[in-house]
């Protein structure tokens, strides 16, 4: 077993912090390792930021190592301290439900071969399994005794909270719970490497120390960069202040695809390195195309396709690609099934057209928000910039016929090349 996985993580830019990489490389060369990453159910779904550590687990598995994915049923009831203040504690049944949903998502990203026959089939665990039976006395004696307050106060987030609004003992103790997870996984499964986001470094190192002090073993830590755009914005925040969720009911496959196809040239190659398994030569070719022929957006299209297949599957990806092409005039709208068309349009502005409402094209442009006024709508029509169902409208007197409504219900309005809205007949 070679340490080539570390070389791959290096050229992909996926190592933010680590314990001694030479020592880790030596252990990787000695044989398969067991590697873990944990994910707290603080929401009903994982989001795009979780993909980077998840895919690093997958990269380790492809290199012959065994991944453990941990759903934080216990730690999710506490919440990792953050700068903006105390978290609202969720009910136990809510956390349990979210943990089950997230467990199902985690299982899609690693391979579950027969553990009895395979040396690197994935394991999924919930830390509630060992945390729940532990009494307060056991926790303080077996875990808390190994930590000094000075060490815990050294974490940046803790220090900032203490200098501001303060922090509860509940959140202050989160580090100990996560550290104990590492010790438990080392004892149960021989886990010797924890992976997480760079904001988890303090918690992960606490686990490394606990394993050394309590069990006398040397284990390793590696963090990946947090996912941000070139301007420093968190990935997905342009979706209206929320996250890009992996659950298709929270972020539709169409919205997911559109987000990544609109990635900036400054970010797209980095995201391809982080989120895909493309080889170096493929990435070089896409980077060269982005520089020489940026209008083709070849890298963006590849990124959107790869990530949508990864999260939503090939069939959903084919449907959203077809919908995307059709909405922007590069395919036949009539070939879209109604569910796909409706989902795509609901990611835009949809105006309702009720019986008796004005239905002229000028009225529809204003109602949909594509034009700020009737005068602006008329000017856009005169300039040839308005299309309905990809057919250019040449008269401001145009009104839709029954046969114009796709599936008897929908009109697709477009102003210019990229401004789209839907009209739904109700």
UniProtKB/Swiss-Prot annotation:
EC number(s) reported in the record: 6.1.1.1
Any single GO CC term annotated in Swiss-Prot or TrEMBL for this entry: cytosol
CDD domains (alphabetical): S4, TyrRS_core
Subcellular location: Cytoplasm
Residue positions binding ATP: 237
Signal peptide limits: none
Enzymatic class: ligase
Catalysed reaction, written as an equation: tRNA(Tyr) + L-tyrosine + ATP = L-tyrosyl-tRNA(Tyr) + AMP + diphosphate + H(+)
GO molecular function terms listed in the Swiss-Prot or TrEMBL record: ATP binding; RNA binding; tyrosine-tRNA ligase activity
PROSITE patterns: AA_TRNA_LIGASE_I (PS00178), S4 (PS50889)
Placement of sequence motif 'KMSKS' region: 234-238
Renumbered ranges of motif 'HIGH' region: 41-50
Domain S4 RNA-binding, first and last residues per copy: 359-416
Any one Gene Ontology BP term: tyrosyl-tRNA aminoacylation
Binding site for L-tyrosine: 36, 174, 178
InterPro entries (UniProt xref): aa-tRNA-synth_I_CS, aa-tRNA-synth_Ic, Rossmann-like_a/b/a_fold, S4_RNA-bd, S4_RNA-bd_sf, SYY-like_C, Tyr-tRNA-ligase, Tyr-tRNA-ligase_bac-type
Alphabetized PANTHER family for the sequence: TYROSINE--TRNA LIGASE, MITOCHONDRIAL, TYROSYL-TRNA SYNTHETASE
Family: Belongs to the class-I aminoacyl-tRNA synthetase family. TyrS type 1 subfamily.
NCBIfam families attached to this UniProt entry: tyrS
Subunit field text: Homodimer.
The protein's role, per its UniProt record: Catalyzes the attachment of tyrosine to tRNA(Tyr) in a two-step reaction: tyrosine is first activated by ATP to form Tyr-AMP and then transferred to the acceptor end of tRNA(Tyr).
The protein's name in its UniProt record: Tyrosine--tRNA ligase
